[in-house]
Amino acid sequence: MENAKMNSLIAQYPLVKDLVALQETTWFNPGTTSLAEGLPYVGLTEQDVQDAHARLSRFAPYLAKAFPETAATGGIIESELVAIPAMQKRLEKEYHQPIAGQLLLKKDSHLPISGSIKARGGIYEVLAHAEKLALEAGLLTLEDDYSKLLSPEFKQFFSQYSIAVGSTGNLGLSIGIMSARIGFKVTVHMSADARAWKKAKLRSHGVTVVEYEQDYGVAVEEGRKAAQSDPNCFFIDDENSRTLFLGYSVAGQRLKAQFAQQGRIVNADNPLFVYLPCGVGGGPGGVAFGLKLAFGDHVHCFFAEPTHSPCMLLGVHTGLHDQISVQDIGIDNLTAADGLAVGRASGFVGRAMERLLDGFYTLSDQTMYDMLGWLAQEEGIRLEPSALAGMAGPQRVCASVSYQQLHGFSAEQLRNATHLVWATGGGMVPEEEMNQYLAKGR
């Protein structure tokens, strides 16, 4: 972006200056609305989420057999919700900032099959596509026991079709593993940030991995191009997919059920704050949508991004969405948080969700490494760097009097609050890689 254009952008949006300087930045969204007001802009409804829920239930008998690690939950891919009181104390001590309320961790990092939040959306979209093909071919009815999809005739049927996706790692992992298990031919287009072990794991499942020297945007574009030339190839579009988004959104009612089981209350007097790491936006956007449907105006969602990849904060704050990239303002999009190394946000998610998100913030790679180490020490939970992005949220919210006043939170409401950090990945990181991460923390 030329200087004159840049100067006028900064004049209009002074916060951009902090982003360019790679400073850890927090922006509380002045444009949030009620769910009733913001919902029409999403273009999806509660019924769409119910349909996704029903589809995952139809596939549960299949998943329980195809992936024995899901058998205990009857083929439902869901993660644990745990309190992390020792980490809460550590954060308060390190940041000299009390965190009012209780701190919880949602362990999507340890979801079965692919060990990340992408086991929600990625697997769901592959299953939805497989179901559509099988129904259209007359091989399946909605009333069937879907475990019949494991039979050789189905494998044979699906092998005529292929799936392609562009990814920095975790989405490719979930789509690759699931597609290969169903019988699809699958190609994952991996950006330069993708970890070697993720590529190796995909190849071990018979997935074709195409590697790029460039970033996520290029990998997605190339994947899209390659798929266009083959009518039997289905491209999973992380930047625009409503199906992926709905796969993530099912998490809302699942979490509501977990809260009920644990006797946790969410209402006006007991607000819920949720902190979601954000790459291109599909995962956190879908989860936030599901949370809003489940808890209404009593849940407050925040997106967390690396200082080197603040694409969603930049897009929503300036209103330019996918018309601007972090590279346009001189930021390099290079971060240890490989799952969040995205320079241009999803235009669909930004526009759909901008009224339903309370805020956005950035944090440095070093902050993620530090918190990664503290969590391992205090709670014995090991995550990959990007999964710690949400962990910086509670102190930002608790430190901001202006945010609390904007939403009219009393001291008592904050004392009764639940702060939920969404841990997005790390359950399958090889030990030597994890040791390298731990060594970087302070």
From Swiss-Prot:
One Pfam short name: PALP
GO terms, molecular function: D-serine ammonia-lyase activity; hydro-lyase activity; pyridoxal phosphate binding
UniProt keyword annotations, A-Z: Lyase, Pyridoxal phosphate
Protein name as annotated: D-serine dehydratase 1
NCBIfam families: D_Ser_am_lyase, PRK02991.1
Quaternary state and interactors: Monomer.
Record has Lyase as a keyword: yes
Protein's gene: dsdA1
Sequence similarity: Belongs to the serine/threonine dehydratase family. DsdA subfamily.
Organism: Escherichia coli O6:K15:H31 (strain 536 / UPEC)
Keyword Lyase in record: yes
EC number annotated for this UniProt entry: 4.3.1.18
Record InterPro entries: D_Ser_am_lyase (IPR011780), Ser/Thr_Dehydratase (IPR050147), Ser/Thr_deHydtase_PyrdxlP-BS (IPR000634), TrpB-like_PALP (IPR001926), TrpB-like_PALP_sf (IPR036052)
UniProt record, GO biological process: D-serine catabolic process; isoleucine biosynthetic process
The reaction(s) this protein catalyses: D-serine = pyruvate + NH4(+)
Cofactor(s) the record lists: pyridoxal 5'-phosphate
First-level EC class: lyase
